[in-house]
Amino acid sequence: MVFRIASSPYTHNQRQTSRIMLLVLLAAVPGIAAQLWFFGWGTLVQILLASVSALLAEALVLKLRKQSVAATLKDNSALLTGLLLAVSIPPLAPWWMVVLGTVFAVIIAKQLYGGLGQNPFNPAMIGYVVLLISFPVQMTSWLPPHEIAVNIPGFIDAIQVIFSGHTASGGDMNTLRLGIDGISQATPLDTFKTSVRAGHSVEQIMQYPIYSGILAGAGWQWVNLAWLAGGVWLLWQKAIRWHIPLSFLVTLALCATLGWLFSPETLAAPQIHLLSGATMLGAFFILTDPVTASTTNRGRLIFGALAGLLVWLIRSFGGYPDGVAFAVLLANITVPLIDYYTRPRVYGHRKG
């Protein structure tokens, strides 16, 4: 009998960083397609701008640090950062905003800490928050979904608005944001928060065109379901684990249900929280970032639950309509503490 002698490693895992990132990029296709369908070609233009900006910014920093540019860019992490930021901002936001946010995310939030694996905060969400705080008007100027929109920009119009601020016929963002009722439309979460503060009843708010969807906001419910489909595929491919998405969604649903039962006239119903804004994108594509999330199974459950609670608190009582980005970054801060207290006990070790 011949025994084969081999050196370590004795187990082989094909889940290299580049492959996992590629799986996440592929899983984003349904969500991207849904956003293209409901919000137009601007989403694709923003993705292209963000992708090019991310690759150039990363290449520049790597060149300055005298590191291999080609080898690092092949891990696809820069592309994923650009993609996540691009789908998080309004589709017709000015071109310089997505470039600025992407460059900030890659250089400051990622490479300044040492590159992939060293950054404590999700780079895409850092870029998003910087843009949201600096340019709140542009970052909240979402188009109405095509089913309730009056003016639907084509591909050429989308490019012209992004780069010049006007369509070929002279239309601007105020014109494009008009809904079928002649009123500028906002996202379902923004509409709900603004209307409640204006003294409108929930019954009145639910009559707005933006809530004409079957389950939640028009268009947004299908966008979230598309991101959910991509997330389920990631779970099936074992590219992510179930702990964070499940604990995040369960906690958000539980908090939203309890809040709605106690104060139905001022707080949004659970289906609006689950199927509006960046809920499913955050649950499966942002919170599950292996670098900035907890690394233990118990820690992942705590991390996801904390993020779900923070999203509900910010949406319900904060100054911003959608709290996913802030919740992710606040939860990122707690990761070292969570990991410290959820470390698996070493076999045979007793607490001293």
UniProtKB/Swiss-Prot annotation:
Any one Gene Ontology BP term: electron transport chain
Source lineage: Bacteria, Pseudomonadati, Pseudomonadota, Gammaproteobacteria, Enterobacterales
Enzyme Commission number(s): 7.-.-.-
TM stretches of this protein: 20-40, 42-62, 78-109, 123-143, 148-168, 214-234, 242-262, 267-287, 301-321, 322-342
InterPro entries, sorted: NqrB/RnfD, RnfD_bac
EC category name: translocase
Coiled-coil region list: none
Subunit-structure text: The complex is composed of six subunits: RsxA, RsxB, RsxC, RsxD, RsxE and RsxG.
Protein's cellular compartments: Cell inner membrane
Its membrane topology: Multi-pass membrane protein
Family note: Belongs to the NqrB/RnfD family.
Needed cofactors: FMN
Family matches, as PANTHER family: ELECTRON TRANSPORT COMPLEX PROTEIN RNFD, ION-TRANSLOCATING OXIDOREDUCTASE COMPLEX SUBUNIT D
Species: Escherichia coli O157:H7
Major location category of this protein: membrane
Name under which the protein is recorded: Ion-translocating oxidoreductase complex subunit D
Function: Part of a membrane-bound complex that couples electron transfer with translocation of ions across the membrane. Required to maintain the reduced state of SoxR.
Gene this chain is encoded by: rsxD
Chain positions with FMN phosphoryl threonine modification: 187
GO cellular component terms, A-Z: plasma membrane
Keywords in alphabetical order: Cell inner membrane, Cell membrane, Electron transport, Flavoprotein, FMN, Membrane, Phosphoprotein, Translocase, Transmembrane, Transmembrane helix, Transport
